[in-house]
């Protein structure tokens, strides 16, 4: 019997749907990734002063190597849906943590669902891309949820380059954390109102600065004009920032670096640096001049 293309596609999709809800085998590991610590030295979650929630964007403090895409995605997800992060980490009580990612299932370009992938990592986490948040539990334990997820992501999806020297796409991170489809768009094609609606709807949103490489192999902005704009805000090239808010002209916002309330003279965007410092409040026009890609994903179906 000869099947036409539509019949083949339908048969393949029906076959794949059998496995959408079937979890993958648990991916255990971490023995050669980190060293097991005594139970109780770290804790996934702790509520720090002014947090309001044990999972907070200010918990993320990137260290020196290139996991900004992972950590900026976590910044934005923590802002919009802290429960999604809490639900993905299980403390095994022995110094190890099991992180559950949502692996998209696609066939012929159609996403049919997700499978759970469990990845177990062990501490201590002092040397990873994410420092402990600085928040401490009543028992004196350091909060380390960003480092736990970063280590698990590296182990599962970036084992060939655990220090992320080749970078990661924030859209991939969002999909694997949230189990939904993420979007990647040119900054120039996403206007102020669209970002405003995305944030109001609870979407996680991350913006990348543009970059090129100079003769010495350093990441730089492509033009002197871009470099001058970026320098005026302390923004660096080839770096991912979580989008905290957009502010219309005439509205007030809190400057992320001074803590002072400011009235916007023109449309503004506030971006959170996963370093844990050097956030940026930029005019929307300047943001469009030095950023090149916007990644977003809904945090709820």
Give the predicted meaning of each segment.
Residues 2-301:
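Accessory/interaction modules and long regulatory regions
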């Amino acid at each position: 019997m000869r099947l036409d293309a539509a019949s083949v596609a339908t048969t393949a999709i029906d076959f794949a749907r059998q496995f959408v809800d079937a979890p993958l085998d648990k991916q255990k590991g971490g023995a050669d990734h980190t060293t097991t610590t005594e139970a109780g030295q770290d804790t996934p979650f702790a509520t720090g002063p002014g947090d309001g929630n044990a999972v907070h964007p200010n918990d993320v403090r990137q260290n020196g190597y290139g996991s900004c895409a992972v950590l900026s995605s976590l910044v934005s997800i923590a802002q919009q849906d802290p429960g999604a992060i809490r639900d993905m980490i299980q403390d095994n009580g022995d110094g190890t943590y099991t992180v559950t990612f949502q692996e998209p299932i696609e066939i012929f370009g159609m996403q049919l669902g997700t499978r759970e992938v469990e990845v177990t990592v062990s501490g201590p986490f002092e040397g990873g891309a994410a420092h402990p948040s600085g928040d401490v539990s009543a028992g004196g334990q350091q909060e380390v949820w960003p480092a736990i997820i970063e280590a698990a992501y590296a182990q599962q999806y970036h084992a060939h380059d655990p220090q992320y020297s080749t970078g990661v796409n924030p859209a991939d991170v969002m999909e694997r954390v949230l189990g939904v489809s993420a979007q990647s768009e040119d900054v120039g094609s996403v206007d102020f109102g669209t970002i405003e609606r995305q944030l109001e709807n609870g979407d996680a949103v991350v913006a990348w600065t543009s970059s090129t490489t100079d003769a010495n192999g350093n990441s730089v902005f492509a033009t002197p004009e871009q470099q001058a704009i970026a320098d005026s805000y302390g923004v660096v090239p080839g770096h991912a920032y979580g989008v905290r808010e957009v502010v219309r002209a005439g509205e007030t916002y809190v400057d992320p670096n001074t803590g002072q309330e400011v009235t916007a003279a023109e449309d503004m965007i506030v971006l959170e640096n996963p370093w844990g410092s050097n956030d940026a409040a930029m005019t929307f026009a300047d943001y469009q001049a030095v950023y090149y890609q916007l990644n977003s994903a809904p945090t709820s179906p």
